[in-house]
Amino acid sequence: MKVRAVVLERIGEISLRDIEVPGTLEPSDNEVRIAVKTVGVCGSDVHYYKHGRIGDFIVKEPMILGHEAAGVVTAVGAHVADLKIGDRVCMEPGVPDFASRQTLEGHYNLDPSVRFWATPPIHGCLTPEVVHPAALTYKLPDNVSFAEGAMVEPLAIGVYAAFKGAIRPGDVAVVAGAGTIGMMVAFAALASGCAKVILSDVAKAKLDLVADHPGVVTVDLNREKLADVVAALTAGHGADLFFEASGSPHAFDDMMDVVGRGGRVVLVGMPQDRVPLDVVALEVKEISVIGIFRYANVWERTLALLGSGKIDVKPLISASYPFDQSVAAFERAAQQNSSDVKIQITF
């Protein structure tokens, strides 16, 4: 079938056109059809646009972009009981093999055969309608807009990172990187019980967006040394947690100086190349290192946090473009303006 979509043709070229895709818009027994209303432009979309690959995921043929989405249910399969036509929803973009070992053990994000929107060779959701498993489609709280619903996907990464970090009430956390994911991690850490989150970056404009947020201390790495700020704020003990959300190899330079004894490091960002790690310091200080990949089993909790008002993502939405201006939206996102956090596309 042919659909109208935002298509990555090749490195540096995006178009809005009709494209032939497999499948049908008629949902099977356990699926729903959704009219897409809002889609966020993710850093991974931009990376594919600029570089054509992320690690082993290589764009070899035209691919529809987009995986952060919210919309309205327009049809339901015969066995779907929890959703109905007209429901406002957001969609978890990774569809695992529901019978795989990883899925059955509760780690469906690690299923090697997961089909994740806009990850080659799987098409994304920047198209007017999609069909998706009902089990991975979630109702939006009444007070959560489509724009906020399209932010659930990146926020879920933050919530999952906070969960894996085993936050204790009163913890002090460092978050390296004030991009979309870093800010989501910071908000989730505070909502999970951290007394203070120290957010560092080289982009002052991004730090300024959250400088007045209760519990957040910002560190401009162009002007201050992170280790000095952490030492001053923790009486020299160091941070309980360090969330690496920048993907920058420089974040590892003084990581072990920043984390306190018995602390935890949660790796969220993905460096392009291998990075050195001070293993001796890690052992002497008994620092635990935890890696995370996307998320699992946190979408309902993420929506509950949004609906409760404990986390407000609206200030992070920098601009919205109509679907027919999608190419312009990607061109802006690719510029990586220091004051932009999230660009969205609306239908």
Each predicted region: which residue ranges?
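Residue-level recognition of short, solvent-exposed, well-ordered loop/turn junctions
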Residues: 27-28, 84, 168, 260, ...
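Glycine-rich cofactor phosphate-binding loops and adjacent beta1-alpha1 units
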Residues: 165-167, 208, 212-288, 327
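Glycine-rich beta-strand-centered segment in the early N-terminal region that forms part
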Residues: 24-39, 54-101, 141-143
